[in-house]
Amino acid sequence: MSYSIGIDYGTASGRVFLINTTNGQVVSKFVKPYTHGVIEGELNGLKIPHTYALQNSNDYLEIMEEGISYIVRESKIDPVNIVGIGIDFTSSTIIFTDENLNPVHNLKQFKNNPHAYVKLWKHHGAYKEAEKLYQTAIENNNKWLGHYGYNVSSEWMIPKIMEVMNRAPEIMEKTAYIMEAGDWIVNKLTNKNVRSNCGLGFKAFWEEETGFHYDLFDKVDPKLSKVIQDKVSAPVVNIGEAVGKLDDKMAQKLGLSKDTMVSPFIIDAHASLLGIGSEKDKEMTMVMGTSTCHLMLNEKQHQVPGISGSVKGAIIPELFAYEAGQSAVGDLFEYVAKQAPKSYVDEAANRNMTVFELMNEKIKHQMPGESGLIALDWHNGNRSVLSDSNLTGCIFGLTLQTKHEDIYRAYLEATAFGTKMIMQQYQDWHMEVEKVFACGGIPKKNAVMMDIYTNVLNKKLIVMDSEYAPAIGAAILGAVSGGAHNSINDAVDAMKEPILYEINPEAEKVQRYETLFKAYKALHDIHGYKKANIMKDIQSLRVEG
């Protein structure tokens, strides 16, 4: 009997799972919020811009060390039988280190400098750099731009590097290496300096055949190419391969065998496809958490406007992986729940239920459109298909009779409409969608939301029993790297998570949602394309004030 470890680094917490490689059984698990959480608003008591989202990398090591120690102790499994470790991580979450892989934010002189810290995926401080990169690419007709949806996001690696170059050159001077936080964990485990093809391909303008796009970098900033060459470029390891064995000192520290193999890191949402067994084309998978990623696989590389990238072999060898997404889903619902009236909070507490459960109870018998509300779910910008992190959310149709649960439902529907925009974009660019999977903690807990989604999309929805699909996917890669399975496909077949339930659309609801979707799309196009300056003009007062 052999086992593998999957370490899943999410936005707010980390998870360490011990998985049976034969049948995918969860033998032990460890879940812990990050000690420093997401650093927003202020850093060590000092105010930082509202577009910043940072983290402390020491939290990542804490998760790994405490988690592995716990699962080995709790399971009583002989560490010799743990053959591999897989890592998944939010992305693009980037870290700046010295030549010994020590994060520069741990240097005393940079304790209060936000640019020394990990830049979390939802850090939007590099929006000016992203715009410059995009405009330069457009002006020079760069051929790669279509592979990234004809856009550049401030959430990606290169704009974030440019941000530090421009605003904190003293940090860049002390930095020896820049990498995805997922690569950093892998390198700490193996004492190597490598990069994953998944992270580079989706977030750093790198392609397997041509490498980095230095011709573009040279035109953006004469210094950029050298920074990438010196600090980012490193040997690349593909998904499905092994980086190598655990470093001897790390094996001793973690209580594992030094023969334990480590796989390259995979982006967290991408790991979910492996965890639920979506390994074919014509299947769209919604990985739903704080944000939602919409992933597809295809034999060909299509240039789909508004997506976040397409990379060969980033999930399944020989297939192109496509990513699109929404920047605020679980985060948005949490925001609404926190605004709930005291009477709702008290009622939920008295009935021993959550505010979410209470609001779902209040809306579950409503018909689509009953509240008269429609919303735009852009509270953290719009990732796809508008690719504009400076857009903001809004809600229409409020009256003095509007109840809090009506607002909640409007936001549930808005995220479903945003997903339909993405699905239609895939379909419009030669990527047929026959199956839709939903995975993550939210689909498993919120049947009302799944009912909304199946009717908005007018597709059968396959809801997975998969609150921890990324961790399972990471463990699958660990199992492959450790030799427990001959291929990713074999490992997926043996270790994937089961289906929880399937739900089909209802004709009357579908028809009503078609009317609502037309209204959503009209508002989407007005405030996203035609008059996007309205929101941005208001936001400029916030930035300047």
Swiss-Prot record:
> Can you cite a GO biological process for this protein?
L-arabinose catabolic process to xylulose 5-phosphate
Question: What Pfam families is this protein classified in?
Answer: FGGY_C, FGGY_N
GO: which molecular function terms?
Answer: ATP binding; D-ribulokinase activity; ribulokinase activity
Q: Which residues cross the membrane?
A: none
Question: So, what pathway does this thing act in?
Answer: Carbohydrate degradation; L-arabinose degradation via L-ribulose; D-xylulose 5-phosphate from L-arabinose (bacterial route): step 2/3
Catalytic function, reaction form: D-ribulose + ATP = D-ribulose 5-phosphate + ADP + H(+); L-ribulose + ATP = L-ribulose 5-phosphate + ADP + H(+)
How would you classify this enzyme at the top EC level? transferase
Give the EC number(s) under which this enzyme is classified: 2.7.1.16
Which cellular component, as a GO term, is one annotated location? cytoplasm
Judging by the UniProt lineage, the source's domain of life is Bacteria
Key words of the record: Arabinose catabolism, ATP-binding, Carbohydrate metabolism, Kinase, Nucleotide-binding, Transferase
The intrachain disulfides are: none
What span is annotated as the signal peptide, if there is one?
A: none
- Family named by the database record: Belongs to the ribulokinase family.
Per its record, how is this protein called by name?
Answer: Ribulokinase
Report the source organism: Staphylococcus aureus (strain MRSA252)
